[in-house]
Amino acid sequence: MKRIVQTVMLLILFTFHFSLFTSSAQSAFDIIELNRNFAASNYSIYPDTVLPNLTPAPEGKVPFYISHYGRHGSRYIENRRGFDVPYKMLCSADSLNELSEAGQMAMSNMRLIFADTDKHWGDLTSYGQRQLRGIAQRMLERFPEVFSGDAHVDARSTVVPRCILSMGSAMHVMAGMNPQLRISMKASQEDMWYMNHQDPVLRKNAMTPEATKAYNMFIERREHNERLMQLLFVHPDSVRGVVNDIWLNYYLIKMGLFQLNTHLYKQTYLMDIFSSEEIYRLWQWENVWWYIMHGACKLNGAHQPYTQRYLLKKMIEEADSCIQLERPGAQLRFGHETVLLPLTCLIGINGFGLETDNLDELEAKGWWASKVFPMGSNLQFIFYRKDIHDEDVLFKVLLNEIEATLPIPTDVAPYYHWKDFREHYLKKIEAYEELRNDASSKKDQ
């Protein structure tokens, strides 16, 4: 019965996941009203179900190499703050006998979550392992030419345990499907300079005064929830000294949405106490935060995506090298959403290179971070050629296993000419590095 319920959930999730890429008619609110998982942003569940058919390659071209960067699968809440902040507020109100029946129920549900999560903070869940196994299986099934015979699979992970286990889950499936594969796995600080680079200069300058002002103006219309205060407390005004309504609202919604990643996914009380409108407002709040911190936001110079310039350059260089081989196989990298999202923005996949200083434009223009980085999210670069002597190598990008678009010309969409891609993005990276070096030189003068 449990598996049937979970299967139904996944089918529902896939329906709305696929609709994001095939229909522009649905608003973010429409999607959230029907599928609240979408509002979880980077906590949302990966829709690992039946995928749309892929566009056939031009005649004679066959897949021969895959370059990939993927996020770890579903995990537990990363640290205790997400639990302690709202729980301590409810405990303080309870000590004053100010919790309503709904407040008591909320606190009871939080205790269940704590009992399940304690000593597992940030760990990969069994659900997360299944997600990565499914992604790996579909990769082999869709591109068998890349993984035939004793093909080499070079798998690398950041040094975070949930990423290492995600890599292991994927490789276990691949080895089972083709025991001849030559699989190598590595998780080392040696690779962190590009696998999980968080540029301190860019990060420090993300929330400029202009960005902070615009952000605060945007969220002040969305951060309060007086209805929640009326629901959870007998006399809301009596607990305002011990309850911060902004953070109570924020963390309770997040906790309710997060449960979908664990075996407590049927315990939906915390999510059910909120209306779709309230959950939608939180999604708007988080979406603009992700844009400022990782998107090409003009309020801070539009440079945040360049945090992943080392990764993109490394992927280009490794692809250039692998193209020279008869059977290069696949290079798979397992990391984090704080890498995958800015990488997607740096490349400009599906319009995520959007540059604006108007945060109210994001939603209308489709800059929805939730479309990029659910648990298990991934970018797959699939390379095609006729044979090793074919100089016109083509490739396409799959974002979460669905064909994506790039902001460069092509006459074979959704395929692109590799030589065009590498030239465009190496120049883009070089231009930024020159700009940064010039700024550094002027600062030193």
Predicted regions and their residues:
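Bacterial Sec-dependent N-terminal signal peptides
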Residues: 1-28
